[in-house]
């Protein structure tokens, strides 16, 4: 069960930066990066467009290379994007970053995760394998968001309404 547990964990953690962060902490994300809702929507559109195109070729690449190598590379590359995000980049750089994440999370990762899950399930347990994967990802997502909100509330010096931008960063 170690393999499927790692797939579950990586399958959710890789989407933390491009999806979860901006969704859960939307008002703060908008303020910290000096964005409006239209600009955030544009970032998600850039991500979605690159991801859509990446699905086509991601399956091909997952057949040519070992899934565990692709997963490791995609996690590392996505984390590098997190380093860029931590530097509070401009809107232009954010658009490039979200396109980059479309490549790292879908082109490199998604097909490899699906293939690794299929291999783990074997010939007769595909349904169980994908049920474990999706159920586990949902549980990990709920846990991460709850933990994130708890940590955020602990470190927030004052009420969110009266906190300044420096406290939110």
List each language-model region with its residue ranges.
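Hydrophobic core of transmembrane alpha-helices in multi-pass small-molecule transporters
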Residues: 81, 92-108
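Membrane-interface helix caps of multi-pass secondary transporters
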Residues: 20-34
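C-terminal ends and interior cores of transmembrane alpha-helices
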Residues: 76-90
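Central cavity-lining transmembrane alpha-helices of secondary-active solute carriers
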Residues: 42-60
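Pair of pore-lining "gating" transmembrane helices in MFS-fold secondary transporters
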Residues: 1-24
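Glycine-rich segments within core transmembrane alpha-helices of 12-TM secondary carriers
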Residues: 130-153
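Intracellular juxtamembrane helix-capping segments at the cytosolic ends
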Residues: 108-122
């Amino acid at each position: 069960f170690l393999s499927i547990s790692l797939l579950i964990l990586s399958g959710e953690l890789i989407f933390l930066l491009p999806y979860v962060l901006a969704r859960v902490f939307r008002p703060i994300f908008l303020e910290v990066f000096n964005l409006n809702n239209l600009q955030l929507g544009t970032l998600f559109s850039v991500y979605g467009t690159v991801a859509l195109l990446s699905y086509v070729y991601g399956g091909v690449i997952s057949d040519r290379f070992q899934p565990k190598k692709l997963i490791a590379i995609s996690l590392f590359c996505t984390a590098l994007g997190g380093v860029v995000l931590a530097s509070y980049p401009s809107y232009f750089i954010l658009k490039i970053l979200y396109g980059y994440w479309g490549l790292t999370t879908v082109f490199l990762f998604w097909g490899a995760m699906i293939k690794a899950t299929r291999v783990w399930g074997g010939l007769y347990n595909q349904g169980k394998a994908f049920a474990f994967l999706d159920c586990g990802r949902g549980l990990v997502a709920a846990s991460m968001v709850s933990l994130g909100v708890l940590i955020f509330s602990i470190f927030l010096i004052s009420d969110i309404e009266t906190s300044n931008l420096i406290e939110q960063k």
